[in-house]
Amino acid sequence: MEFFFYSSSLATIVFTVCSIFSRNLMYSLLYLILSFVFTSCVFFSLGATFAAALEVIIYAGAIMVLFVFFIMMFNFKKSTLYAEKIFDKNNYYYINFLFLLCILIFPFFFILSYLYKEKIFYMVVSTKLVAIKLFSDYILVIELSSIVLLSALIIVSHIGKIRR
């Protein structure tokens, strides 16, 4: 389970950096989606299955898909990121060197964790306990958020009828 934790953590970092430095906006969003998926793998390896499911459903499943549809709808060919102006082809050698350095240092920390026999602490939180806590102690927050979502739905449908 520790190897799964460390490998998904490394993949999260790599895909986040790829998302930041990607020149194509669509690829950048896809890297960010992969970063969210591997972040949920980190949560899963720590025993927080509910947080992992929420990470995939809310971030990767809903928000990022909306971003992808937005980019596809407005048809952006290339992004105007600040990173494009800073990093030219000569500076990519430094980025590749940093990635290589991270890949070489990663096994060193993995071996150190086995030497000191420190295990990752995790506690399994069941979905039932989260639901009981949400709908007993935090019922007012749940109801207020549902009212906000309902009002947003009504406003969007009203704006849609006006534009027709």
Swiss-Prot record:
EC number(s) recorded for this UniProt protein: 7.1.1.-
Protein topology in the membrane: Multi-pass membrane protein
Reactions this protein catalyses: a quinone + NADH + 5 H(+)(in) = a quinol + NAD(+) + 4 H(+)(out)
Location in or out of the cell: Cell membrane
Pfam families registered for this protein in UniProt: Oxidored_q3
Residues annotated as transmembrane: 1-21, 30-50, 54-74, 94-114, 138-158
GO CC annotations on file: plasma membrane
UniProt cross-references to InterPro entries, sorted A to Z: NADH_UbQ/plastoQ_OxRdtase_su6, Nuo/plastoQ_OxRdtase_6_NuoJ
The protein's enzyme class: translocase
Biological role stated in the UniProt entry: NDH-1 shuttles electrons from NADH, via FMN and iron-sulfur (Fe-S) centers, to quinones in the respiratory chain. Couples the redox reaction to proton translocation (for every two electrons transferred, four hydrogen ions are translocated across the cytoplasmic membrane), and thus conserves the redox energy in a proton gradient.
Subunit structure: Composed of 13 different subunits. Subunits NuoA, H, J, K, L, M, N constitute the membrane sector of the complex.
Protein name: NADH-quinone oxidoreductase subunit J
